[in-house]
A protein has these predicted regions:
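Hydrophobic ligand-binding cavity/cleft-lining segments
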Residues: 1-44, 148-151
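Well-ordered beta-strand positions in beta-sheet-rich domains
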Residues: 4-6, 60-64, 87-89
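Short amphipathic alpha-helical segments
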Residues: 12-18, 126, 130, 134
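A generic structural signal for ordered secondary structure
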Residues: 20, 50, 88-90
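Glycine-rich portal/gate segments that line the openings of hydrophobic small-molecule binding cavities
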Residues: 27, 37-83, 100, 132-151
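Beta-strand/loop substructures that line and gate deep hydrophobic ligand-binding cavities in soluble
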Residues: 78-132, 149-150
């Protein structure tokens, strides 16, 4: 499964990046996120339990977050459940209209015969939808609060 979501946000690149890496902020600015719980925490690596909803359906997963400040990227690796092994890459590219934020999800389903069905349910219904909503809400937040967000 390969899913890509992107959006252009009209604020400085590091403002968007710092907002994206600040997982504690997510439940306050992303209404579909119920909570983020840290299991391990350090400046460049965290292990978290993330919980969101999709059309009222609660879901949660455990991820390792790697913050790469040199490359200005955020990587996640799902550690448990149906999405175990999924790799997620957030990139931030300056473009004339602002910053192009892209989220790429890559997952090889463990049960190959179920992959087409899992792609529709896990990939399209959950992941693609939640990532789009995350980007839209993050855009609204950072564009409305540019002077309040620390880069």
């Amino acid at each position: 499964m390969h899913k890509t979501n992107s959006i252009t946000i009209c604020v400085p690149k590091m403002t968007v990046f710092e907002t994206a890496v600040n997982l504690e902020l997510w439940p306050r600015i992303l209404p579909h996120y119920r909570y983020i719980r840290y299991l391990e925490r350090s400046p460049g690596r965290n292990v978290v339990v993330m919980a969101a909803t999709r059309s009222g359906i609660p879901i949660s997963w455990t991820s390792e977050q790697i913050i790469d400040r040199d490359r200005v990227e955020v990587r996640f690796r799902h550690l448990k459940a149906f999405t175990k092994g999924m790799r997620v890459l957030w990139t931030f590219q300056e473009v004339p209209a602002g910053v192009q934020v892209e989220i790429k999800h890559d997952l090889a389903f463990r049960v190959k015969i179920l992959a087409p069905i899992a792609d529709k349910i896990i990939g399209d219904f959950f992941i693609h939808h939640i990532a789009n909503k995350t980007l839209r809400c993050m855009k609204s937040y950072v564009e409305a609060n540019t002077n309040k967000v620390t880069a």
